[in-house]
């Protein structure tokens, strides 16, 4: 078996090197060889479903947990989250100049009250009288999202309604434009189907190809099939023969050929009994790229296909260069995020199919530009924000809720929607006040909080620390960033006293961070303390440094020392790379270290692509053997080989690095383009912003062009120290990167 797998690896590597020499479509929705199955058309209204903020995420999370339990073998999920509720009320005061018809749709049990009087209606429609009326809808469900969609009487806009789960605390309903079909509830399946044919079929033993896609398998023979695209979906084929056929699936050939079911991350598929008459076989949903088929007595297989479930997206950001290798890295990254995009930006689709706070929110750094699906990002924000009235016992991973405000600010900057922060205002304030109440005398949050005491989890690249249950410097910097961001939103809400309170907490914490964790000799942050919370951990890791840059507290005068002397000399810094890299590479871009960023990308992400993979994994072990690369949690196939968070680094490297895109947080309609093309001759890109699209054609030599939408200002910085080109009017402009 080992010799065959080794030979198989050589054959596949050769084929992948050939196909990667030119641009490849890694996303099934863009692959011309993949068929997108048309969905049944549904009536659409000029309105959209609305629900209590965070409740769609709560029901979606429950769905993910159920899917995970049915399919995944090893699942752990520390922490308590915002609970689902089967009851909601929607209210609005109206004043009509003429009699009007109002229709609605939603779950079965919806009651309308007008001026406090319960209405007896049929057909989910009512005629509203002229004059003032107080409307109240009560929606009750058994086990689905309490929601409603309206049509008529000029009352369709969810932003003009209020929603409550208890008739006491009211807020702005949540909604999204994709949920505009009255016959499809928001928590109903939304995926589209991509029909994928095999990329390669390799007879392994006593098997041969029959025609283009037929397979003849003899007694105890088997074949290996590669679909190229790693997705979650169902396998279907026509089969006739005798005995049984055993189907094994995996993210790698090794996993798909594994005979020991105890080593698998997904429950094994039951053998299928064949008949000589033949028939269609459709197997339960699995995450896979590779499939092996083994027959004990022989079979004829035809019409093999993989029906992958894809979240419907619009590919908003575009990026292309003269270097196909860079293009493929970008496309593979985008596909990694899309594969992981089901209701949320998920953790590994094979191993657990669950949303986690850090994974979901670091993914928005790229996903918000690639796809612009604000609701998916908001779902991640909701699970990161703690449940109402949080307690210490609710904590799973102490630093994970601190990603929520990072995601909220990213969401506000990208979409320009203050409504989101207002919808989650109570939970934002409760989160910040909760953390302020559980810190020690220095204002520090500890890693041993929570019933399970899971500990800090900055990612898996912790060879240099910090320890899990001490006082980690990076977590305190995250808390500082949360206070600063809380003040930022309080200012937007025009609540000056609240903003001042958070600014004071931030000032005091920043002072303590430098007193306890700044190493003035080495000009970096140390890790913090060991698990006893007393012994100082003077080791240096990258986590506190990049959070320091993102939070604007790492001294800029020490950037050179950090990037030239400290980081390159950290043990295993380049050898063990994890899913926090999207954050860290954003810090690289912010510090202007574009060459170092891309050298890191080529060395890690490029190496993974060169090995023939089509998605990026949760963690990289650069010096490990092929078998060891797949091991995680001491399980032979425990590593997730498609992890949305690691689709982010290359996109950040392209958007914030090569293009040099950034946005002012104080004047949010002001953008900066600071290109650094490195070896590239040209870049063509379309960047979605809240005002529309910025379209760029950057040329290292000669004329470059830019088109900007109305309502924004774009600054183009061509050289350090030179006056920037400032563009304030909608239209197209030309310029040169070199004078």
Residue ranges and their predicted role:
Residues 559-567, 598:
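Alpha-helical repeat scaffolds
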Residues 1-23:
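Bacterial Sec-dependent N-terminal signal peptides
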Residues 256, 305, 312-332, 337-339, ...:
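Active-site acid/base region of carbohydrate-active enzymes
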Residues 531-536, 567-575, 603-609:
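Solenoid-like repeat scaffolds
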């Amino acid at each position: 078996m080992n010799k065959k797998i080794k030979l198989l690896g050589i054959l596949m590597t050769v084929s992948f090197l050939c196909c990667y020499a030119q641009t490849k479509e890694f996303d099934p929705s863009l692959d011309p060889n993949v068929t997108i199955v048309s969905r049944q058309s549904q009536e659409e209204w000029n309105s959209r479903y609305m629900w209590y903020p965070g409740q769609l995420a709560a029901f979606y999370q429950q769905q993910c947990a159920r899917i995970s339990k049915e399919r995944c073998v090893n699942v752990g999920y520390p922490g308590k989250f915002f609970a689902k509720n089967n009851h909601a009320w929607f209210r609005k005061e109206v004043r009509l100049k003429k009699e009007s018809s109002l229709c609605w749709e939603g779950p079965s049990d919806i009651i309308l009250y007008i001026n406090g009087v319960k209405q007896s209606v049929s057909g989910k429609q009512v005629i509203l009288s002229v004059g003032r009326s107080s409307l109240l809808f009560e929606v009750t469900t058994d086990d689905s999202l309490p929601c409603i969609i309206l049509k008529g009487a000029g009352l369709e806009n969810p932003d003009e309604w209020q929603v409550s789960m208890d008739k006491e605390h009211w807020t702005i309903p949540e909604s999204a434009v994709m949920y505009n079909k009255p016959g499809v509830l928001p928590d109903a399946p939304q995926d589209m189907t991509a029909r994928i044919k095999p990329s390669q079929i390799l007879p392994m033993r006593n098997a041969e190809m029959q025609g283009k896609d037929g397979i003849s398998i003899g007694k105890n023979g088997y074949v290996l099939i590669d679909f190229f695209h790693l997705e979650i979906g169902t396998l279907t084929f026509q089969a006739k023969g005798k005995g049984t056929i055993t189907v094994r699936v995996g993210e790698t050939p090794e996993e798909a050929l594994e005979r020991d079911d105890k080593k698998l991350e997904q429950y094994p598929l039951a053998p299928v009994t064949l008949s000589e008459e033949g028939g269609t076989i459709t197997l339960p949903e699995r995450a896979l790229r590779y499939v092996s088929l083994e027959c004990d007595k022989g079979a004829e297989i035809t019409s093999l296909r993989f029906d992958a479930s894809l979240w419907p997206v619009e590919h908003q950001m575009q990026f292309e260069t003269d270097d196909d290798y860079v293009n493929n890295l970008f496309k593979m990254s985008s596909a990694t995020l899309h594969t992981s995009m089901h209701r949320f930006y998920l953790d590994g689709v094979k191993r657990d199919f669950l949303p986690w706070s850090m994974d979901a929110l670091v993914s928005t750094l790229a996903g918000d530009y690639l796809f612009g699906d604000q609701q998916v990002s908001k779902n991640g924000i909701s699970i990161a924000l703690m449940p109402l009235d949080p307690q210490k016992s609710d904590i799973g991973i102490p630093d994970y809720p601190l990603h929520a405000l990072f995601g909220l600010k990213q969401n506000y900057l990208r979409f320009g929607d203050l409504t989101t922060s207002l919808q989650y205002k109570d939970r934002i304030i409760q989160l910040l006040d909760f953390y302020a109440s559980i810190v020690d005398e220095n204002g520090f949050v500890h890693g041993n909080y929570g019933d399970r005491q899971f500990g800090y989890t900055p990612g898996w690249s912790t060879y240099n620390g910090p320890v899990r249950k001490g006082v980690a410097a990076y977590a305190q910097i995250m808390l500082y960033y949360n206070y600063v961001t809380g003040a930022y939103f309080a200012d937007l809400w025009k609540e000056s006293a609240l903003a001042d309170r958070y600014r004071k907490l931030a000032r005091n914490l920043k002072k303590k961070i430098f007193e306890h964790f700044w190493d003035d000799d080495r000009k970096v942050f140390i890790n913090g303390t060991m698990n006893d919370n007393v012994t100082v951990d003077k080791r240096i890791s990258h986590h506190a440094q990049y959070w320091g840059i993102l939070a604007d507290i790492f001294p800029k005068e020490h950037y050179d020392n950090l990037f030239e002397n400290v980081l390159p000399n950290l043990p295993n810094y380049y050898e063990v790379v994890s899913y926090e890299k999207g954050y860290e590479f954003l810090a690289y871009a912010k510090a202007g270290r574009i060459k170092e960023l891309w050298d890191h990308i080529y060395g890690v992400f490029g190496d993974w692509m060169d090995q023939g993979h089509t998605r990026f994994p949760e963690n990289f072990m650069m010096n490990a053997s092929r078998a060891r690369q797949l091991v995680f949690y001491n399980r032979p196939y425990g590593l997730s080989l498609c992890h949305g968070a690691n689709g982010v680094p290359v996109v950040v490297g392209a958007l914030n690095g090569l293009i040099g895109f950034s946005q002012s947080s104080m004047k949010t309609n002001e953008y900066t383009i600071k290109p650094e093309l490195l070896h590239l001759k040209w870049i063509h890109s379309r960047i979605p912003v809240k005002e529309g699209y910025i379209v760029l054609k950057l040329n290292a030599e000669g004329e470059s062009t830019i088109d900007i939408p109305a309502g924004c200002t774009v600054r183009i910085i061509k050289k350090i120290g030179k006056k920037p080109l400032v563009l304030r009017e909608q239209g197209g402009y030309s310029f040169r990167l070199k004078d």
